[in-house]
A protein has these predicted regions:
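Class I S-adenosyl-L-methionine
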Residues: 101, 122, 213, 294-298
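Conserved dinucleotide-binding and phosphotransfer motif residues
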Residues: 103, 157-158, 300
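Auxiliary Fe-S-binding modules of radical SAM enzymes
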Residues: 2-28, 221, 230-308
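Conserved AdoMet/S-adenosylmethionine-binding subsite of the radical SAM
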Residues: 115-272
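Short cysteine/histidine-rich metal-coordination sites, predominantly Zn2+-binding motifs
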Residues: 59-65, 83-89, 111-122
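Iron-sulfur cluster-binding cysteine motifs and their immediate structural context
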Residues: 44-51, 70-86, 94-110
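Flexible, acidic/Gly-rich N-terminal and inter-domain linker regions that tether
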Residues: 1-72, 80-81
Length: 308
């Protein structure tokens, strides 16, 4: 079946909402982390709300705005209320962005061709020669799966270490295509219970668990680290950690497992995209609280526990 021109464009270009250089938490060594736009989940605690939508949107930096009201001339694109602009995101905003003198109005992402993104990645190749590499994150990288596989192949050809951070909520077909070109695979298993996962992320955990079962029984199992972000009252419960560990070690007793402390700093990003963040009252866990969760995982039978 022939691909439509629009479909070919989607494969040859990717929407990227951030490229973070010198990252140290997304794999070994100093890394360049590429954040792909679009995610099938809607986690209540999402750390990157600007990466949720699959389309390019407009964001507003309140701290940059000088209240010149230049944007008020664009009445079809902007509804100005309470001393701030609200955007109709189906409109073309090129002229609006050019008009804003303080860059308070910007697109939330950029289009990258394979060559353009590869050139950007290779700006840091000196670090890749000393244990670093590139990590593909999001959003959900598999939402732009065909492009992802193409850039992974290019990285492997250039001998650049590759990692991915993924929810694994995607087709097994795409996973199988990507795995040969990945050196490290971080997979989030947030909440074991399917109904609770549905409530907290808007999708069931069934597909994620099926895909995890496949990869932990495959030849690529040693590349995998399963992660659970610890969110107060949601994923950070003894029962949830116990269920996840029992599930994992039943598939592969040598599985590597990591728990990530809650990060309360994401709330500032929600204002940029005009979304409400409902977890402002939650705080990071203390060292003692984290040790408790480690103990729960160890008592459940995990052998390879990665600690912060």
């Amino acid at each position: 079946m022939k691909l439509l021109k629009e479909q070919l464009m989607k494969i040859s270009k990717a929407l990227v909402f951030d490229i973070k250089r010198f990252a140290i938490h997304d794999g070994s060594g100093l890394r360049t982390t590429v954040f792909f736009k679009g995610c099938p989940l809607r986690c209540l605690w999402c750390q990157n709300p600007e990466g949720l939508n699959t389309q390019r949107q407009v964001i507003y930096f309140k701290n940059k705005c000088i209240h010149c009201r230049c944007c008020q001339q664009f009445k079809e694109q902007i509804n100005y209320q309470n001393d701030r602009p609200y955007f109709q995101n189906h409109q073309d905003f090129d002229q609006v962005i050019k008009t804003c003198p303080s860059s308070a109005i910007q697109y939330d992402s950029q289009e990258y061709t394979l060559d353009k993104l590869m050139n950007k990645i290779k700006e840091d190749e000196v670090f890749f020669q000393h244990g670093g590499g590139v990590t593909f994150s999001g959003g959900e990288p598999f939402m732009q799966g065909e492009f992802l596989i193409k850039i992974l192949k290019r990285c492997q050809k250039e001998k650049i270490h590759t990692a991915i951070e993924t929810s694994f909520y995607t087709s097994l077909e795409l996973i199988k295509k990507a795995l040969p070109y990945l050196d490290l695979v971080y997979i989030d298993l947030k909440i074991f219970d399917e109904q609770k996962h549905q409530v907290c992320t808007n999708v069931s955990s069934q597909l994620i668990k099926e895909n995890i079962r496949y990869v932990l029984q495959s030849e690529y199992k040693d590349k995998v680290i399963i992660r659970t972000p610890l969110i107060p009252t949601m994923s950070a419960t003894d029962e949830n950690i116990h269920q996840i560990v029992k599930f994992l070690i039943q598939i592969n007793p040598e599985v590597k497992y990591e728990m990530l402390n809650y990060n309360p700093l994401a709330s500032a990003k929600y204002e940029l995209v005009n979304l409400k963040y409902g977890l402002e009252s939650y705080q990071m866990f203390t060292k003692q609280q984290m040790q408790h969760f480690y103990d729960v995982a160890l008592q459940a039978g995990i052998k390879n526990l990665i600690k912060e």
